[in-house]
């Protein structure tokens, strides 16, 4: 048990696989891809933040490709998973049990998320 605790301290919370690192390195060589991805993330993050604000959901400001948001209904992660939308619960990282990490997707993915969240009210 002690060894498992020690190993757990060394592992980063959102680890990245070797193939993902190789793909990311190759993507960085394509400046057009990087610029398009940056633009998409900026636009789509604003769309999600505006939606969360209108719905009264608390979220943490983000400078990355994800948002931490408190979703005000029980079992939000499971309900979204049932609709083929995966989000990560952040309770094990010290946040409230209703706080989730939502990655910024493309316009269609984010619209699907918004539509499903609207249906939960």
Features from the language model and the residues they span:
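PLP-dependent aminotransferase class I/II
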Residues: 1-52, 57-58
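Short beta-strand/turn micro-motifs at beta-sheet edges
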Residues: 13, 87-91
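Conserved PLP-binding catalytic core of the aspartate aminotransferase-like
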Residues: 42, 46, 50-83
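PLP-dependent enzyme catalytic core of the Aspartate aminotransferase-like
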Residues: 82-83, 92-121
């Amino acid at each position: 048990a002690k060894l498992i605790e020690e190993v757990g301290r060394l592992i980063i919370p959102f680890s990245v696989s070797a193939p993902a690192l190789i793909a990311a390195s190759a993507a960085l060589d394509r400046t057009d891809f990087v610029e398009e991805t940056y633009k998409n993330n900026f636009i789509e993050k604003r769309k999600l933040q505006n939606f969360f604000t209108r719905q009264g959901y608390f979220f943490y400001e983000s400078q990355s490709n994800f948002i931490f948001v408190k979703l005000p209904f029980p079992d939000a992660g499971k309900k979204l998973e049932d609709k083929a939308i995966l989000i990560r619960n952040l309770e094990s990282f010290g946040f409230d049990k209703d706080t989730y990490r939502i990655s910024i997707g493309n316009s269609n993915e984010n619209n699907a998320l918004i539509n499903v969240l609207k249906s939960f009210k």
